[in-house]
């Protein structure tokens, strides 16, 4: 059931210590049976696979050109019509954005969109051409025969900063996680607009909201499927923590009172969605 090294240790392409041997016939059938059950019995109409590139590795850990599991998912009579979304990389360094084996069925989280647009929006030099590529559907990544929604465009997700925090913090602040602020990504491409974290300065607060509006405007006018993090539409904050997996408290909860405080942002996002 697991990928093993020649000396019997676990391969770790998942970041959690072991990796399921997805393309072994027995394991592949087990996965297909589980997904079919969710579709037939619970009417689930789509699946998003975390670290999906690990699904395309062989028994020795190497990437396969035609992974049997991914091909089976694409052509299965039950699963062949549900939405399939891949986080097209894994914890072992395999990065397949634009090249994930998809049989014209899978959509991909476009990590290049996130990184390039973050850098462009905060004014990094030399990013205009990359931003154009992302906005028009990333044709440098996805060939003309790809569906327009093959790219799932996003600037924020459950991993990393919220949109509010992207423009309120230059550095992550994960001290509450207990790892001396060593966990979580350092490649945030964020900008605090002049002050780190909380402020009552009206000029900085106005600038931060403008940056959030810029991000939503670009995202919702880009070719491809648009995705944003719940709470971003009303300025939810995680207080600079960009890795809240272990926080079941005010750090990770949605503060619905922000909906009233940031009604202007919420109205703008609603209108942008209607415009799209």
Residue map of PLM features:
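Substrate-binding/active-site clefts of carbohydrate-active enzymes
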Residues: 1-44, 48-75, 94
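The substrate-binding groove and active-site-proximal loops of carbohydrate-active enzymes
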Residues: 12-29, 52-64, 103-106, 194-208, ...
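A non-catalytic, amphipathic alpha-helix used as a structural packing/dimerization or gating element
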Residues: 30-33, 37, 207-214, 218, ...
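Conserved, mostly hydrophobic/aromatic
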Residues: 31, 38, 49, 84, ...
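Conserved alpha/beta catalytic core and glycan-binding cleft of carbohydrate-active enzymes
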Residues: 43, 59, 64-230, 243-247
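Active-site-proximal loop/turn and secondary-structure-junction residues that shape catalytic pockets
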Residues: 53-55, 90, 234-235
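Short acidic/histidine-rich active-site segments
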Residues: 229-234, 238
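Catalytic cores of secreted or luminal carbohydrate-active enzymes
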Residues: 260-276
């Amino acid at each position: 059931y697991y990928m093993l090294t020649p000396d019997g240790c676990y391969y770790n392409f998942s970041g959690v210590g072991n990796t399921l041997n997805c393309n072994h016939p027995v394991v592949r059938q087990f996965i297909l049976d589980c997904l079919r059950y969710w579709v037939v019995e619970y009417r689930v109409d789509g699946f998003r696979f975390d670290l999906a590139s690990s699904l395309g590795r062989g028994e020795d850990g190497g990437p396969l050109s035609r992974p049997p599991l991914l091909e089976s998912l694409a052509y299965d009579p039950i699963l062949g019509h549900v939405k399939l979304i891949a986080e097209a990389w894994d914890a072992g360094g395999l990065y397949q954005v634009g090249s994930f084996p998809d049989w014209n069925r899978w959509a991909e989280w476009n990590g290049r969109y996130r990184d390039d647009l973050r850098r462009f929006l905060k004014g990094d030099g030399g990013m205009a051409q990359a931003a154009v590529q992302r906005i028009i559907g990333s044709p440098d990544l996805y060939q003309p025969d790809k569906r327009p929604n093959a790219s799932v465009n996003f600037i924020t997700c459950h991993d990393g900063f919220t949109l509010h925090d992207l423009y309120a913090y230059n550095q992550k602040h994960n001290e509450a996680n207990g790892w001396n602020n060593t966990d979580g990504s350092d490649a945030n491409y964020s900008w605090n607009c002049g002050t780190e974290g909380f402020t009552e300065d009206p000029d900085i607060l106005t600038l931060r909201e403008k940056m959030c509006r810029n991000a939503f405007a670009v995202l919702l006018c880009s070719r491809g499927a648009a995705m944003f993090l719940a709470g971003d539409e009303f300025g939810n904050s995680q207080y600079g923590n960009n890795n809240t997996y272990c926080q079941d408290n005010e750090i990770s909860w949605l503060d619905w009172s922000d909906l009233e405080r940031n009604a202007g942002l919420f109205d703008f996002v609603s209108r942008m969605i209607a415009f799209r």
